[in-house]
Swiss-Prot record:
The active site is at 328 (proton acceptor). This is 3-phosphoshikimate 1-carboxyvinyltransferase. Pathway: Metabolic intermediate biosynthesis; chorismate biosynthesis; chorismate from D-erythrose 4-phosphate and phosphoenolpyruvate: step 6/7. Residues 1-24 are annotated as: Disordered. It comes from Synechococcus sp. (strain CC9605). Gene3D superfamilies: Enolpyruvate transferase domain. It catalyses: 3-phosphoshikimate + phosphoenolpyruvate = 5-O-(1-carboxyvinyl)-3-phosphoshikimate + phosphate. Pfam families: EPSP_synthase (PF00275). GO terms for molecular function: 3-phosphoshikimate 1-carboxyvinyltransferase activity. It comes from the Bacteria. GO terms for cellular component: cytoplasm.
């Protein structure tokens, strides 16, 4: 498994044992990105408690600093302060803005920068990000008058953005994508007239909740499709943001706790935004034993502690209708399916083919190496579970969610495994491997 550009030896993953205890997962990645972005274009100071100190939000912070925004050092457990420059105060940077591995950073930056009239920006990223499609953001922005250029007709980074005075419009997004929607809402803040974004189904709504909290003139409605309207001209005001734990990171513990004999885990302070809880719906459908403890509301976002204990699971079948609320959880659910007696089916998941990796192909390939019975389809997979997985030489193929999913699978295998490029987990959960050891019993 060479050619990774990494010198790290494969991580040894021991089979067997159980997991018990309490765990706090890192701050929600979506909310971390947005609190930095909205704080940067607000007036005054924004404080962020619980910001995820992982590679993707660090990329967003680095881009904002390059445009004159003062952001305090981002450390684990520290409070981050952002000194806002106002809705049109971002400076033209002297260097290329490096988005690292973060598709969220690049897509939201396109919306943020498209309306900076008279300023020029270049966005780039790592080899993986340079392969990810960006036209899905650039094309609707163009209907507002934005100018985005790049390889493959503006689809692939590096991307050049020439800031323009944008015009408000009504835009339908072809897919329910929080990143596309959020980019358009950011662009709408400095347009000449109101903008309405219509999405075919609801995607994650962190941007709407948070922009309203920061003071944007934003309304949500619509009978057919979901309409989000922004009237430009409002001044955003700095806020104190408390970032809940990321349910996409909690998902690894939820599935591990449900699958592993003797497991009893409590995951503290997890964001339970209804646009993100598809994983809980599917685990409920499977018969998993999950309790929501101490439900509460923190800064407009529902939060709770989740307790999961081991029990028998049934196979599942889910598709397009629930996909926006669990798109990042498909890799770990594919692991769960391997241990359910019977056939599980995932469909409507073609979006996973353009994530950090082709996640459908990578999960099928790696689980098959452990002996799983999987058929891959264009938009999903069929998994016939109930046969034991065996330890194997595995590879995250540089994908953080694949790395952690395989870490759970390896605990349940017959025989030990090794995992190449396990350090990919740091993109969203830097302490994952340490926590796995701590909870092990």
């Amino acid at each position: 498994m060479s050619g990774t550009g990494q010198s790290d030896d494969p991580r040894e993953l021991k089979a067997g044992g159980s997991l018990q205890g309490r765990v706090k997962v890192p701050g929600d990645k979506s909310i971390s990105h947005r609190s930095l972005l909205f704080g940067a274009i607000a007036e005054g100071t924004t404080t962020i408690d619980g910001l995820l100190p992982a590679e993707d939000p660090l990329s967003t912070a680095a881009c904002l600093r390059a445009m004159g925004v003062s952001i305090s050092p981002i450390t684990d457990g520290g409070i981050v302060t952002v000194e806002g420059v106002g809705v049109d105060g971002l400076q033209e940077p002297a260097e290329v803005l490096d988005c690292g591995n973060s598709g969220t950073t690049m897509r939201l930056m396109l919306g943020l920068l498209a309306g900076r009239d008279g300023r020029h920006f270049v966005l780039d990223g790592d080899a993986s990000l340079r392969r990810r499609p960006m036209r899905r953001v650039g094309q609707p922005l163009a209907s507002m008058g934005a100018e985005v250029r790049g390889r493959d007709g503006g689809n692939l980074a590096p991307l050049a953005v020439q800031g323009r005075q944008l015009k408000g419009t009504v835009i339908g997004t072809p897919v329910a994508s929080a990143q596309v929607k959020s980019a358009l809402l950011l662009a709408a803040l400095t347009a000449e007239s109101p903008t309405t974004v219509i999405e075919p189904a609801q995607s994650r709504d962190h941007s709407e909740r948070m922009l309203k909290a920061f003071g944007a003139d934003l309304t949500v409605g619509g009978e057919i499709g979901r309409h989000i309207s922004v009237r430009p001209g409002a001044t955003l005001q700095g806020k104190n943001v408390v970032v809940p734990g990321d349910i996409s990171s909690a998902a690894f513990w939820l599935v591990a706790g449900a699958l592993i004999p003797g497991a009893d885990l409590t995951i503290e302070n997890v964001g339970l935004n209804p646009t993100r809880t598809g994983i809980l719906e599917v685990l409920e459908q499977m018969g998993a034993l999950i309790e929501v403890l101490n439900p509460r509301d923190v800064a407009g976002e529902p939060v709770g502690d989740l307790r999961v204990t081991h029990g028998p699971l049934k196979p599942f079948n889910f598709g397009e209708e629930i996909m926006p609320s669990l798109v990042d959880e498909v890799p770990i659910l594919s692991v769960a399916a391997c241990f359910c007696e019977g056939e599980s089916r995932i469909s409507g998941a073609s979006e996973l083919r353009v994530k950090e990796t082709d996640r459908l192909a990578v999960m099928a390939r790696q689980l098959k190496a452990m002996g799983a019975d999987i058929d891959e389809h264009e938009d999903g997979m069929t998994i016939r579970g109930g046969r034991p997985l065996k330890g194997a030489a595995l590879d995250s193929e540089t994908d953080h969610r694949v790395a952690m999913s395989l870490g759970v699978a390896a605990m349940l295998a017959d025989g030990n495994s090794s995992l190449a490029r396990s350090e990919a987990a740091a993109v969203s959960y830097p302490s994952f491997w340490d926590e796995l050891e701590r909870l092990r019993c």
